[in-house]
């Protein structure tokens, strides 16, 4: 099969900008050729947060956001092409995840909604665009998430090492790759989402740089216990979650009746993220009687990989695991998800399945997404 070029677009639950990557794919290999981070205006981000947090809206507002995001994503692609000097004619397709504004896989009328009009992306970039990746999996009874584990399996499967790939974005999710075992993957709970929201409320910062603020606080055990007493953490996989559950109103409810310094709340939120991740990862740890004698690695990607407090707490709580970033295993930790959706676009373009039913709970394998031709 000839080498093909794809672009991946990712705007995650943190809403901290639009990540774009240019990759070359040839059967079982993928190579990063270029990447760019494109800013999202504060007014657009706030409008999206308002919808995600359940504020009243209307179809016109949702439609306008879909339109604005389509242009934003297209502009991000154009900037990437200008930076790399690559012609649009040489790109096979764009894979656009879209901006999730609601994800509800467990209700009677399960649905997920990602905004960012792919028609606009295709028309403005003159590149065929593939989008709406999650709903086909949900149509087959799946969660529609997580979808990146199939990509993780492609990159990191090993015959002699158990690897858990941990993505810490707004939400944290894991992919468990145990030699000769089915892949497991699901959302563990909040990643950076609550920490980002809390610091933004208190001093306007987008995130806690190097966990400087959290490091000035002390973990409050009463609050931590309340946070951990969320039914989601007792649910079996497959499962997925988002801002619909874990948000500032949820946190404020947990803070009810407690008089805690703001920096202590931030420290507790960091510990909360670390503990919820650890509680899941440790269930895949080999015990001394296990027949598995493989090494154990926790490979971290996403924005949380840059949080030294989180990384230190994970290493302390998982002493039998080698904790490192995916960058140390050859895949840039900041571009993992955007690369995954470029790869999923490649799979769809060639009519190959992109989901893992054992991860999402879907009734079968399926090609994902809808294709929007360039012309």
Curated annotation (Swiss-Prot):
Q: Which residues cross the membrane?
A: none
Q: Which CDD domains does the UniProt entry name for this protein?
A: ASKHA_NBD_ANMK (cd24050)
EC no. given is 2.7.1.170
A single GO molecular function, which one?
phosphotransferase activity, alcohol group as acceptor
Q: Where does ATP bind?
A: 12-19
GO BP terms: namely: 1,6-anhydro-N-acetyl-beta-muramic acid catabolic process; amino sugar metabolic process; peptidoglycan turnover
Q: Which Pfam families match?
A: AnmK (PF03702)
The pathway it acts in is:
Amino-sugar metabolism; 1,6-anhydro-N-acetylmuramate degradation; Cell wall biogenesis; peptidoglycan recycling
**Protein keywords:** ATP-binding, Carbohydrate metabolism, Kinase, Nucleotide-binding, Transferase
Reactions catalysed, semicolon-separated, are:
1,6-anhydro-N-acetyl-beta-muramate + ATP + H2O = N-acetyl-D-muramate 6-phosphate + ADP + H(+)
| InterPro entries named among the record's database cross-references | Anhydro_N_Ac-Mur_kinase (IPR005338), ATPase_NBD (IPR043129)
What the protein does comes down to: Catalyzes the specific phosphorylation of 1,6-anhydro-N-acetylmuramic acid (anhMurNAc) with the simultaneous cleavage of the 1,6-anhydro ring, generating MurNAc-6-P. Is required for the utilization of anhMurNAc either imported from the medium or derived from its own cell wall murein, and thus plays a role in cell wall recycling.
Q: Which family does it belong to?
A: Belongs to the anhydro-N-acetylmuramic acid kinase family.
Q: Give the protein's recorded name.
A: Anhydro-N-acetylmuramic acid kinase
Which organism is this entry from? Photobacterium profundum (strain SS9)
């Amino acid at each position: 099969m000839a080498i093909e070029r794809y672009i991946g677009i990712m705007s995650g639950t943190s809403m901290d900008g639009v990540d774009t990557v240019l990759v070359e794919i040839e059967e079982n290999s993928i190579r990063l050729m270029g990447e760019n981070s494109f800013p999202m205006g504060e007014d657009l981000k706030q409008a999206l947060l308002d919808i995600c947090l359940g504020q009243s809206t209307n179809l016109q507002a949702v439609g306008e956001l879909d339109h604005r995001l389509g242009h934003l994503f297209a502009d991000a692609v154009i900037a990437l092409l200008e930076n790399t000097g690559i012609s649009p004619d040489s790109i096979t397709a764009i894979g656009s995840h879209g901006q999730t504004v609601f994800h509800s896989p467990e209700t009677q009328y399960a649905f997920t909604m990602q905004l960012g009009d792919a028609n606009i992306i295709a028309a403005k970039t003159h590149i065929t665009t593939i989008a709406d990746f999650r709903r086909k999996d949900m149509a087959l009874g799946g969660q529609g998430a997580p979808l990146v584990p199939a990509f993780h399996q492609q990159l990191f499967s090993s015959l002699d090492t158990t690897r858990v790939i941990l993505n810490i974005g707004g939400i944290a999710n894991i992919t468990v790759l145990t030699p000769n075992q089915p892949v497991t993957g699901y959302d563990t709970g909040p990643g950076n989402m609550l920490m980002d929201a809390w610091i933004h409320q208190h001093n306007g910062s987008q995130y806690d740089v190097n966990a400087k603020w959290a490091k000035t606080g002390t973990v409050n055990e009463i609050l931590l216990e309340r946070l951990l007493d969320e039914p989601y953490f007792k649910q079996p996989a497959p499962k997925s979650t988002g801002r619909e559950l874990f948000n500032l109103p949820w946190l404020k409810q947990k803070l009810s009746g407690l008089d805690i310094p703001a920096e202590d709340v931030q420290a507790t939120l960091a510990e909360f993220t670390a503990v919820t991740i650890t509680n899941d990862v440790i269930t895949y740890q080999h015990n001394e009687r296990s027949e598995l004698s493989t090494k154990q690695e926790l490979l971290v990607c996403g924005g949380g990989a840059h949080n030294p407090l989180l990384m230190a707490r994970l290493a302390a709580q998982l002493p039998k695991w080698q904790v490192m970033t995916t960058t140390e295993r050859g895949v840039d930790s900041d571009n993992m998800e955007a690369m995954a959706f470029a790869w999923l676009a490649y799979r769809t373009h060639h009519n190959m399945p992109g989901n893992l039913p054992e991860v999402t709970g879907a009734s079968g394998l399926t090609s994902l997404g809808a294709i929007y031709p360039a012309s």
